[in-house]
Design a protein with these regions (language model features):
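Helical mechanochemical/support elements of P-loop NTPase systems and associated helical scaffolds
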Residues: 7, 26, 61, 65-68
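Short acidic, glycine/proline-enriched loop segments that cap or flank alpha-helices
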Residues: 18-21, 40-41, 56-65, 77
Length: 110
């Protein structure tokens, strides 16, 4: 399913509101993952999205990308404003999984 991409400035603003730090490598990877997912939400995150990001960022393997995204999400969850997180994930008591986070933010921002 092809969709309309979301503006990068809106995406990055939302990530910063959730507590993501722009100086972490995972921040850029999360932003790119969400942007790619909005362009083709039918693709599998682990089987298609991480390898596609690894091609775009050759310094990272798909495994390293998954780990960096997970770390960035967990850090933002731990240190970010809880009320912002509740807007997107009202029922969670722990950080969302990568796929859940990417899909939810992509759908909310489209």
């Amino acid at each position: 399913m092809q969709t309309i991409p979301i503006p990068q400035n809106q995406l990055r603003h939302t990530l910063r509101q959730l507590g993501f730090s722009a100086h972490h490598s995972g921040y850029r990877l999360v932003a790119e993952a969400i942007a790619m997912y909005t362009q083709n939400s039918a693709q599998s995150i682990t089987k298609a999205l991480y390898p596609a990001l690894a091609k775009q960022f050759p310094a990272y393997s798909a495994v390293n990308i998954e780990r960096a995204i997970r770390y960035a999400i967990n850090e933002a969850w731990e240190h970010g404003p809880r009320e912002q997180w509740q807007q997107y994930f009202p029922h969670l008591t722990k950080a969302p999984a990568n796929a859940c986070f990417i899909a939810t933010l992509a759908e909310e921002l489209m």
